[in-house]
Amino acid sequence: MDVFQKVEKIGEGTYGVVYKARNKVTGQLVALKKIRLDLEAEGVPSTAVREISLLKELKHPNIIKLLDVVHREKKLYMVFEFLTQDLKRHMDSSPTSELPLPVVKSYLAQLLEGVSFCHSHRVIHRDLKPQNLLLDGLGAIKLADFGLARAFGVPLRTYTHEVVTLWYRAPEILLGSKFYSTAVDIWSIGCIFAEMVTGKALFPGDSEIDQLFRIFRTLGTPSEATWPGVSQMPDYQSSFPKWSRKGLEEIVPSLGPEGKDLLLRLLQYDPSQRISAKTALAHPYFSPGHSLAPQQCTAGRSSR
């Protein structure tokens, strides 16, 4: 790692510290992510190194470029392209927190493009949130940390003991499902969509049960009628309070009918009925035309 000069610490992610760094030879600015795991005593598992190395093949305008992976001395370093701001900081710094609706539409389309691309390569994110959506200052939004959950799992707490946010976590994960699909990312995108529109987190829970109950209070407590199989999930309780569904008018009043319809499809309880990223991009909300990042994208592989 001698080729990189650390400029400053720019964040502490789920798995380790992130530095802004400069390549001493080329002058290129990069984000240097130093992975620190509980299992560092015995080093980074070779499976994780393999998983992460595969991510170098994911090339798309709406996915942060992984430039290199360096594994040495029981540590793993990931070298990413450098972007200056994330969506959370951007929303926090604007006077009202919510974004203009044309910007919301552009960002949502780009997120769906990036997620659709990853899903077509059988990569699930599992931990999408505004903090790992990065902005380039030119209108593009890019997904960071794709694939890390599969390599390392999603811990309950970060290595600095901060709680990993539950706000964007799909109900099937909260209900203890060990088998989940690309639909978990679609749920997260629905939560992020609503937050971009209103400037407020849709379901800001502070524990798993609080998170579930916030979802239930808004979307109604799920039943076998609305989500076949829900009563068989490991953490489902028949004693859950029975809340009825709120209207979307209360939740996202400024969103037009097409936007509300798309949000409902992103936040379907039953994962098998949740809209896919590819289908969402064809939704009437995005017509006529929407602003997207450039379409030239390549992949070094077609399956995992």
From Swiss-Prot:
SUPFAM superfamilies (alphabetical): Protein kinase-like (PK-like)
The organism is Mus musculus
**Domain Protein kinase: start-end pairs:** 4-286
Keywords assigned by UniProt? ATP-binding, Cell cycle, Cell division, Kinase, Mitosis, Nucleotide-binding, Serine/threonine-protein kinase, Transferase
**Designated name of the protein:** Cyclin-dependent kinase 3
Query: Entry's InterPro entries?
Result: CDK (IPR050108), Kinase-like_dom_sf (IPR011009), Prot_kinase_dom (IPR000719), Protein_kinase_ATP_BS (IPR017441), Ser/Thr_kinase_AS (IPR008271)
Q: What's in the GO CC field?
A: cyclin-dependent protein kinase holoenzyme complex
Q: Which family does it belong to?
A: Belongs to the protein kinase superfamily. CMGC Ser/Thr protein kinase family. CDC2/CDKX subfamily.
Could you tell me which PANTHER family the record lists for this protein? CELL DIVISION PROTEIN KINASE, CYCLIN-DEPENDENT KINASE 3
